[in-house]
């Protein structure tokens, strides 16, 4: 249902970065009303977001910790590759990138397989 490739984890990381720097959210920077962002890679958007934040004074991302809440798919086996990809963009050591997965045990929209929630924190300098 997303305008870009709708990678919910990377979108949450982008929003956290922008929020930490007081720069709004991804919808302000990459509006879904602008066709140049239609089907764009979320990795590319993360790169652009990181550049925006660096121009605003971000020195580095010290660590991040995000939880993906969905019934399916089971994601834990994907985490090493996901962490490597995030590290490549943000320059943070893989050891400082923590990803977790949880379910709602069948409850709510996540439990019915209708959507995914991502919560997290990011520490920046």
Would you name each region that the model predicts?
Residues 65-70, 74, 80-110:
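Short, conserved loop-to-beta-strand elements that form functional interface hotspots
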Residues 110-125:
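C-terminal edge-of-domain segments
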Residues 1-79, 90:
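RNase III-family endoribonuclease catalytic core
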Residues 43, 100, 122-123:
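Short, intrinsically disordered/low-complexity patches at protein termini
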Residues 52, 85, 89, 123:
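Mid-sequence acidic-hydrophobic segments that form the walls
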Residues 1-3, 81-83, 112-114:
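Surface-exposed beta-strand edges and their flanking turn/coil or helix-capping segments
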């Amino acid at each position: 249902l997303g305008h870009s490739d709708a990678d919910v984890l990377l979108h949450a990381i982008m929003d956290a970065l922008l929020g930490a720097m007081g720069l709004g959210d991804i919808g302000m920077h990459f509006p879904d009303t602008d066709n140049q962002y239609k089907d764009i890679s979320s990795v590319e958007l993360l790169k652009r977001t990181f550049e925006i934040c660096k121009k605003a004074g971000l020195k580095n991302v010290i660590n991040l910790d995000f939880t993906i809440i969905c019934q399916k798919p089971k994601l834990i086996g994907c985490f090493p590759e996901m962490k490597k990809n995030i590290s490549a963009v943000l320059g943070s050591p893989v050891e400082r990138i923590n990803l977790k997965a949880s379910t709602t045990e069948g409850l709510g929209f996540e439990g019915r397989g209708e959507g995914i929630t991502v919560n997290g924190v990011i520490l920046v300098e």
